[in-house]
């Protein structure tokens, strides 16, 4: 069936997909994440040192090294005092990965940009080695030290994921046919699929608690990238 899918992909839509790029089926099931205020406070203390202020509903924490904000939907940010986090010869990427590990954020470096004396490192959160596509942290370095975790673009898992039922992901053949239909219906241009990355997406209602982690594919093409929800079959262009 997988071989047939490659032929159908080409015959119906003229989209190329090399056989060696086609991955194994997804071995992931949906997970739920419930906000854990105690974990949040522990993470704030790991970032800020001894906490001097932590309101009952959390949100804003103040400590020896600066201040941080944590939101119900997973957004977080921090501003650090001068001298709190000197690089001390470390590379910004390595420093960022190690720092985020202290708050249980298993990080994968996505990009590094330098502009106007600042180095900006963007990292993606993983859970047990699997990327969570819409959980990223953006760390800003200046003058050889960490200055901030950027607001509005930094999101984390708010608790420890737990398995949620046994619903199995759609197989790749089904998803490929969904993609063909999506491309045709939306008059998208796509000549070739160039890569697949397995991971999770958070359900669109990020304010819900618990939130759901949905098995998904991140699919690159010659004309942009897409997220394929492997439970519902929904196709969403990146960005």
Language-model segment annotations:
Residues 146-239:
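Extracytoplasmic/luminal low-complexity segments enriched in Pro/Gly and acidic/polar residues
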Residues 98-106, 138-142, 182, 186:
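Structured segments of extracytoplasmic/periplasmic soluble domains
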Residues 1-111, 122-129:
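Preferential activation on post-signal-peptide N-terminal prodomains/segments
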């Amino acid at each position: 069936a997988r071989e047939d899918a490659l032929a159908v992909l080409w015959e119906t839509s003229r989209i190329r997909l090399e056989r060696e790029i086609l991955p194994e089926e997804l071995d992931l099931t949906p997970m739920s994440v419930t906000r854990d205020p105690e974990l949040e406070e522990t993470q704030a203390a790991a970032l800020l040192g001894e906490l001097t202020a932590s309101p009952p509903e959390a949100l804003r924490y103040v400590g020896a090294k600066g201040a941080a904000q944590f939101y119900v939907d997973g957004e977080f940010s921090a501003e650090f005092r001068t001298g709190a986090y000197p690089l001390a010869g470390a590379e910004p990427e390595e420093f960022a990965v190690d720092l985020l590990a202290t708050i249980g954020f298993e990080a994968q470096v996505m990009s590094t940009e330098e502009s106007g004396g600042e180095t900006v490192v963007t990292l993606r959160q993983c859970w047990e080695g699997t990327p969570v596509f819409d959980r990223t942290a953006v760390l800003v370095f200046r003058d050889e030290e960490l200055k901030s975790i950027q607001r509005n673009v930094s999101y984390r898992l708010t608790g420890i994921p737990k398995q949620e039922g046994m619903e199995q992901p759609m197989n790749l053949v089904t998803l490929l046919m969904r993609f063909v239909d999506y491309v045709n219906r939306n008059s998208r241009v796509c000549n070739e699929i160039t890569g697949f990355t397995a991971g999770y997406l958070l359900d669109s209602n990020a304010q819900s608690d618990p939130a759901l982690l949905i098995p998904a594919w991140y699919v690159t093409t010659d004309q942009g990238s897409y997220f394929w929800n492997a439970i519902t079959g929904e196709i969403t262009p990146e960005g």
